[in-house]
Each structure stands twice: as structure tokens, then as C-alpha cells.
């Protein structure tokens, strides 16, 4: 089982490390043709507008949409969550539109407002250390979206079908439980496809 990490920008090596430490084969994705090699994909944190520009530059938008529409699992963290949103507050449309949610960018403020919190993430982990850096917030979700975690009453982790997304950076700690939960999602999907 192979899991790709979109390697255009952002915390790529940290995701690779946690995936590898959890027993998955992890590869950096830089070209559209590489998506065919992987069973699941991580859209890492970084800067969402820069990431979107690079996605367009390398003609990855349509292949990423098709990857998600095929039912293969995708995990988005921080900027990745923004890319997965159907709607961005104050803007017309989201980017990939995989999750029926309204997201507000930089809702927790700029870099100096970075902080850590301990969260319970439903079905994933209790007391997970979450690192927030200029983090987005999920302001609203549709009826098919499962809220997995909240911080001070604000939604910070969601799941819809084969899509998992969080406002924080799970890759910036040594706690691999969110990655392990994602690996399990990918493994279960791979078993279904094999039958």
C-alpha cells in the first residue's frame, strides 16, 4: 500500500516520516502521472494560495479532482483542508470542493498566534497534541460531514466519506495516531477495491 504526499510546498518530509514510521510506503507526488501509483494522498500544510498556484502550474488540478472522485482517501492538513473545502468564506468558490464545508482562512491569526492544544479526535485519538499555525477554521458543515474535533467550540477536524481534514499540523509532532487512522482508511478502501 502506497500513500502519496503532494510535494509542491509545505511540510512534506514530516508527513513522509510519520507515514513511514507507521509502516506505510510513502512517496512524494510532484507529477500527475504519479497519482496512479498511490492508494491514498495527503495534501500537506503550507500556504494555500501558493499551493493552488503550483497545482495549476503543474497541471495537477484535474488529476487531483479525479483522484478524489475515484473514492481514494485524501487527508488534508491546514492548507490541505482549505484546498478540500467546497466554499471559502468571503470568496465565491473553494478549490477541489471535496468536503461540504465553509472554511475561513487564517481564522486563528498570523504566525505569532501559533499554539498547541490537546484535542480528542473522534474515532482517531484522545489527547492528541495539535499544532496550529495560521490555522483555518471550519465555519459550517453540510449534513454528510462528520465533525471529529472542536477547539473552544470551533470545528477543527472533519470527515466526509473518504475525505479527512484538519486545521492543525499533525505531522509536526511525534504522535502518529492521525496518520495511522488515515492509513487504516486507505487499507480498508484497498481491500474493498480488491473484491
Curated annotation (Swiss-Prot):
Catalytic activity annotation: aldehydo-D-ribose 5-phosphate + D-glyceraldehyde 3-phosphate + L-glutamine = pyridoxal 5'-phosphate + L-glutamate + phosphate + 3 H2O + H(+); L-glutamine + H2O = L-glutamate + NH4(+)
Active site: 78, 169, 171
CC terms in the record's Gene Ontology section: cytosol; glutaminase complex
Entry EC number(s): 4.3.3.6, 3.5.1.2
Keywords from the UniProt entry: Glutamine amidotransferase, Hydrolase, Lyase, Pyridoxal phosphate
InterPro entries in UniProt: Class_I_gatase-like, PdxT/SNO, PdxT/SNO_CS
Chain positions recorded as L-glutamine binding sites: 46-48, 105, 133-134
Domain of life: Bacteria
Keyword Hydrolase (UniProt): yes
GO biological process: glutamine catabolic process; pyridoxal phosphate biosynthetic process; pyridoxine metabolic process
Alphabetical list of PROSITE patterns matching this protein: PDXT_SNO_1, PDXT_SNO_2
Pathway it works in: Cofactor biosynthesis; pyridoxal 5'-phosphate biosynthesis
Hydrolase recorded as keyword: yes
Function recorded in the entry: Catalyzes the hydrolysis of glutamine to glutamate and ammonia as part of the biosynthesis of pyridoxal 5'-phosphate. The resulting ammonia molecule is channeled to the active site of PdxS.
Assembly: In the presence of PdxS, forms a dodecamer of heterodimers. Only shows activity in the heterodimer.
NCBIfam families: PLP_synth_Pdx2
Family: Belongs to the glutaminase PdxT/SNO family.
Record's protein name: Pyridoxal 5'-phosphate synthase subunit PdxT
Species of provenance: Shouchella clausii (strain KSM-K16) (Alkalihalobacillus clausii)
